Amino acid sequence: MSATPRVRVLEIFASLQGEGINLGRPAVFVRLAGCPIRCIYCDTKYSWDFNAGVEMGVEEIVAKALALSVVGHVVVTGGEPLIWQRRGLEELACALRALGSVEVETSGAYPPTPELDRCVDFYDVSPKLSNAGVKAPFSPFYASSPKAWFKFVVSNADDVEEVERFVVAYGIPRGRVFLMPMAESPEEHGEALRRIWDAAVRGGFRVTPRLHIMAWGNARGK
């Protein structure tokens, strides 16, 4: 690892966690640059560029997060944050614990290093179904991690059936799985939620809304 680790940061902002196990929780978000997955429905396509944003040191990032005065929970997101492993992500996650619990949002394509895992409280994992338009690997590490919670982006009953097959294939505990409506606007969110409602009930899956989409659409920094 670098003696003075630096990562590329797109934005640091305070908001509510809009999805998943920490739904509605006030948090500081640290968005890192770069994603090799590139799902067709991605709502942060500006994060794909590995050279976007600005290079920042760990201490600088922590100081900016602290200045937002929202302490207790930090979400490291992207992009795909785990591409920064062994290039500063481990040091960043451990340093951010000064603010509270640390949640890492990931596609699940890459397993964490032991150094990273020690400093993460929650993995917010979003494995890619066929509706993503890409083929992405999935690390079995997350299926057995007590820190991992899963969000599947779904638009219809067929997507929910694919989630069922995925969960069974990897032995993922059903109680750790959330279905999440595919949407970029409040109107799309409501429509997708209605389409998946009955399938979620039949499959015994929890559903997470996307609060930021419901309130702000696809606005950046929310």
From Swiss-Prot:
Query: Which annotated residues bind Mg(2+)?
Result: T44
Q: In which residues is [4Fe-4S] cluster bound? A: C35, C39, C42
Radical SAM core domain sequence ranges: 22-222
InterPro entries recorded for this chain? 7-CO-7-deazaguanine_synth-like, Aldolase_TIM, rSAM
Q: Name one GO molecular function term.
A: S-adenosyl-L-methionine binding
Q: Which reaction does it catalyse?
A: 6-carboxy-5,6,7,8-tetrahydropterin + H(+) = 7-carboxy-7-deazaguanine + NH4(+)
Binding sites annotated in the UniProt record for substrate? L16, Q17, G18, R31, T77
Q: Which residues bind S-adenosyl-L-methionine?
A: G79, S126, P127, K128
What family is this?
A: Belongs to the radical SAM superfamily. 7-carboxy-7-deazaguanine synthase family.
Q: Read off the HAMAP family from this record.
A: QueE (MF_00917)
- Tell me, how does this one assemble? Homodimer.
Q: What is this protein called?
A: 7-carboxy-7-deazaguanine synthase
Protein encoded by which gene: queE
